[in-house]
Amino acid sequence: NSLDNKLVIDEKVAGTKLKVEGSGEIGDKILAGKATLEELAGTAKVGDKTASDEVGTQDGIIAGKMSAKVGDDGKIVASTVKRAIQQHNQAVSSMANLSLMTWRQENNDMNKRLGEVRASEGSQGIWARMARGQSKYGQQGIKNQYNYYQLGYDSKISDDWILGGAFTYTDGDSNYTNGSGTNKHTGFAVYGSNLRDDGSFIDLIAKYAHMKNDFDVNGGVGSGDYSTNGLSFSAEYGKRFHQEGYWIEPQAELTYGRVSSADFTTKNGASVHQDSMDSLVGRLGFSLGKDIKQGNVYVRASYLYDFQGDTSVTMSKGGAATSFKTDLGGGWWEFGVGTNLDLGHDTHFYLDVETTAGGDVDTPWQWNAGVRYSF
């Protein structure tokens, strides 16, 4: 643990190799510029000469493992220096990115939120929905299983427009190599939907949420918790074309989201700074459906692309610091199947199941169910 400790060797047999390995604490000091690999090599001596042929350090709180070869002159051979990533801290970085991942997953089109609102009668409506799913991300094999709840009310303010609001709550449990975590969002949304007789619609929604995250990592900076805030604004346009009981509905949507920065200290005393994260997701897609006596059934497909999505997490302690950059931007596909059913008595039920493919964040499954009562 200390460079003051010395290994004095009386004689080194020809052909033998000696490796001196320092603790993670020494690795952190080297990363902070308070010590050097050459000083570590010099802790083993034969007479007044360095006996080390190779040096290395274990994982520190901030620094990953280091290694290097030592020349005959006792100096480090620069071309052999290797610095590994502290895997536990990379997991913490990935956990911090869950805020953006889960916030982006809460983006939803009008049909997911309200079901077949066109079929609703009455000037007002109350509705509730729940979504449950799983997402996967990163080299650490992070799996986040989440539940998403909304409770809303809306009212017609004209022949074409309805205006409403909703309370939202999300809770998730994540697991990954050497750790686990939880994430919770509490917030609200306001929306306006324009539904026209020609089958076209415009849907506008703004959302806010307060996010709480905690993680427990075996090693590195250790465990911690923090809070941040998320905002998003979305606009969607679509038009339904009917033909003999079947219909197709092209859709286009643009969503901007932002998760604010956060600063916190872990249980191991490390300071962590998470940069703010921006997301700008464009979506082009369609749904293809068939009208049935009780409502309709449909399949849908969309291509989504996040034009932003990059962020970084910086961890530091005692002058040692490391940063992890992540880019969640890029495109992915979304496929779904669902139904909207008239249960009678001004009540409608809707169910949707989806999966994604081709993106950095994979959602193998998610189901979404809701009920709406109009009066």
Predicted features along the sequence, with ranges:
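Membrane translocator/pore-forming domains, dominated by Gram-negative outer-membrane beta-barrels
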Residues: N89, G122-G125, R129-F375
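Outer-membrane translocation/initiation segment of Type V secreted surface proteins
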Residues: N1-D10, A14-D159
